[in-house]
Amino acid sequence: FGGTMKKRLSVLLLTLAVLLSGCSKPIDTTENSEKLQVVTSFYPMYLLAQAVTEGATELELRNMAQPQTGCLHDYELTISDMKLLENADVLIINGGGMESFLEQAMERYPDLVIVDTSHGIELLEEEEHHHHHEGETEEEHAEHSHGHDHEGNPHIWLSPERAAHQAEAMAAALGELDRADAELFAANAEAFHRAAHELEEKAHHIDIPEGECSAVFHEGFAYFAELFHMENVFGIFADEYQMPSAKELTEAVDEARGHGIRFFLTAADNGRIYAETLAAEVDEAIILLDPLTTADEENLSYLERMEKNIEAVEKHWKEETE
């Protein structure tokens, strides 16, 4: 992507648009009423919302998609999702085109307050995919959106600084609806932003030369390449529907050799085998990173999991330079 970024000015759906009929007052969260029911679309938003709402007494936080769902590309609402949203006051989404079911949810639940946390955040341009359906022509591949919003890369939670802005958007929105906890939300978001900034500083102090080449095998890891000032040469994204062809893999090996790529960033998913194959061709090791899209056994926080990712890159670089 060469550092190119694109401003996405999506609509912050909280802004009274869904509450124009005089319902824009704070939702009553006194002890005589039910608590504010807050739902997050998927696990990264749940992790951020946990940080923002820690210590709050007037809301209940639930996550919609199952903890092992992963990204929400092409996700369809289940019966249990619909039941959860029917009883929810607020739905917090990542935005940026991640939640393909959003229009359906808005139509089905017109009174649901939807907080789009991508509002005003700069998205990286979406990577040129190095995969397509077997037998597709290039024209068909270009038309095959695979459920993505091609205005930008929506995996913004993998940038600590952007995630901090998402947390602040959550705090501001929830504070308008739950005035009793508004100061708490703001303080939590501020503390999160400070910690996220420290993570970014830790990444920058690893002292990887600017412009070091990388290849990513998960779309979200373009944000990691940016964090470490890497030049991302290509991306290979595989799933159960799409796999890279032999020709594409051969071309990728040539690119890896030609650019001297030393950073192969992958998750423990379908892309891992391709990352390992290409890395082995140039006598390198993969860097296994956590996209934060699923629950982990240790129940770690967003900040803890991101710190482990940064440490994984640091460990790889130390081994490279020993």
What is the predicted role of each segment?
Residues 1-4:
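Short, Lys/Arg-enriched N-terminal segments with co-localized hydrophobic residues
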Residues 22-322:
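Extracytoplasmic metal-acquisition and chelation regions
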Residues 6-9, 78:
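Hydrophobic alpha-helical segments with strong N-terminal bias
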Residues 8-26:
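Sec-dependent N-terminal signal peptides of Gram-positive bacterial secreted proteins and lipoproteins
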